[in-house]
Curated annotation (Swiss-Prot):
NCBIfam families: IscS (TIGR02006), PRK02948.1 (NF002806), PRK14012.1 (NF010611). Its EC number is 2.8.1.7. One of its GO terms (biological process) is [2Fe-2S] cluster assembly. Its cofactor is pyridoxal 5'-phosphate. The lineage of its organism: Bacteria, Pseudomonadati, Pseudomonadota, Gammaproteobacteria, Alteromonadales. The keyword Translocase does not apply. This is Cysteine desulfurase IscS. It comes from Shewanella sp. (strain MR-4). Gene3D superfamilies: Aspartate Aminotransferase, domain 1, Type I PLP-dependent aspartate aminotransferase-like (Major domain). Disulfide bonds: none annotated. Pyridoxal 5'-phosphate binds at residues 75-76, 155, 183, 203-205, 243. The gene is iscS. It is found in: Cytoplasm. It catalyses: (sulfur carrier)-H + L-cysteine = (sulfur carrier)-SH + L-alanine.
Amino acid sequence: MKLPIYLDYAATTPVDPRVAEKMFQYMTMDGIFGNPASRSHRYGWQAEEAVDVARNQVAELINADHREIVFTSGATESNNLAIKGVAHFYNKKGKHIITSKTEHKAVLDTCRQLEREGFEVTYLEPEANGIIPMERLEAAMRDDTILVSIMHVNNEIGVIHDVDAIGELCRSKGIIFHMDAAQSAGKLPIDVQTTKVDLISISGHKMYGPKGIGALYVRRKPRIRLEAQMHGGGHERGMRSGTLATHQIVGLGEAAAIAKAEMATDNARIAKLRDKLWNGIKHIEETYVNGDMTHRVSGSLNVSFNYVEGESLMMALKDLAVSSGSACTSASLEPSYVLRALGLNDEMAHSSIRFSIGRFTTEEEIDHAIETITQSIDKLREMSPLWEMFKDGIDLNQVQWAHH
């Protein structure tokens, strides 16, 4: 068993060896290294063919037409292109956008930028289980609303939104619906023929593909128009200029094909390991799961251990590669804004750990994790005066702390 045990699959996944092997064939002189836009020789034609195959593989993952797939550098770029692209193209129609407080920073900061440009953004509060109620979304809609951007699966707590219902509501009101599927593509079935979603952001490195590659699904019927954010040679039907990175695109395509073929078996195995982990630690006193337990992606478990400081817990769990929130904001010592939006107080938000399990996690690793967590919590609480006060029956919310 390799230490530390990797339990941070929501931050990134290792590239599947089958994907890596395929990618190597598209880099060197011995392989297919040409520019897919070179139309005058075989090197270019072969590269273009490889890109076409990968485009089809990504399209098949979500049951789309291959012409609806635009390759980007990742979900952050896809989110920027979708949100800014719609806002700038449709701004004559309206300048109001709806999103939620628990979105990824790539959506929230893009919306903040649009606010600086004169757009108005409504940030919806989720329920305590992390889910946005439909009536709250509907109540926020206005005549000048042009876009709703709600993630499919939350990156910190793993809850799944009812994107079918959101899509129906948006379509009935003539509002464009963008869905950030970085955490769900390749893990949950997505079918654009049945779900009325107009734009979908996809990330390669969240589904055992390489980093630095992603895609944006852009619906053709009814047709969604975007204003390009990256200008140049007019690649990707003018929506995203820049030489296509054949080896990374091939990697994304292969990862999508594997995910589609193995999704059901992967999910069943991962859910079993996730349940084993939760059943192994839920007996620890004052331990709570964050987010809805039924509407949840199989590999995710966000747990708060009351009266334990999150950072000290992370240090105590040095054999486990876990995080206390999203990797993109884990460098800051602020409590997770996602957990705060769920109504957790700072202490509970600070004492939370995100465990995310994936394709290469083993049962032996979960056993070791349970043992490590149990021992670490016991040790840290032994040293905690707050735990002692709690055990003595003192209500810590009523304590008047002296400020020096």
